[in-house]
Amino acid sequence: MSLRRLAQVSLGLGGLILMGMGAYFVFLRPPLLPEDARYVGASLAQIQSAIPLFLPWVSRVFGVLGGYMFATGLLTAYLAATSFREAKPLPSAVVVVSGLVSIGWMAVTNFLIDSDFKWLLLAFVLPWLVAVLSSLIADMRASKARG
């Protein structure tokens, strides 16, 4: 498999992962995880008692966040299947920036809050990282071959 193809497939996988995360946030994620209550230093019952409408509200917030994750993943997968196939600078720059501010920042934040899911999220960064590095190496080799 060529480096360009590896970059394309890895980016597509990263897009599918984001779509899966988005679906989880929309359909399966509870309003608060045990780690959320632990982080704020209160039990779920205390939070519910102190702010009765918080759980329904945050459930909607996570639903919206999940929709954005799914859309980001869909666009990432589309980019992998179309313009990322060619060694053009703009799609590569979009992939770098969008990966940094989406799954990259999510992984960093989960390490900052010592999330139970920090290692899983770091693993979800790997396809994006493979895509970026493979693309960069392929571009450098192509540039060197052209002289």
Where are these regions (language model features)?
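Membrane-water interface at the C-terminal end of transmembrane alpha helices
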Residues: 128-146
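Hydrophobic transmembrane helix segments
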Residues: 16-62
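Juxtamembrane helix-break-helix junctions at the cytosolic face
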Residues: 73-91
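Membrane-helix boundary connector in multi-pass membrane proteins
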Residues: 104-123
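Short, Lys/Arg-enriched, Gly/Pro-containing loop segments at transmembrane-helix junctions
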Residues: 33-37, 142-147
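Hydrophobic, membrane-inserted alpha-helices
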Residues: 75-79, 100-109
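Alpha-helical transmembrane segments and their helix-start/interface "positive-inside/aromatic belt" motifs
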Residues: 4-19
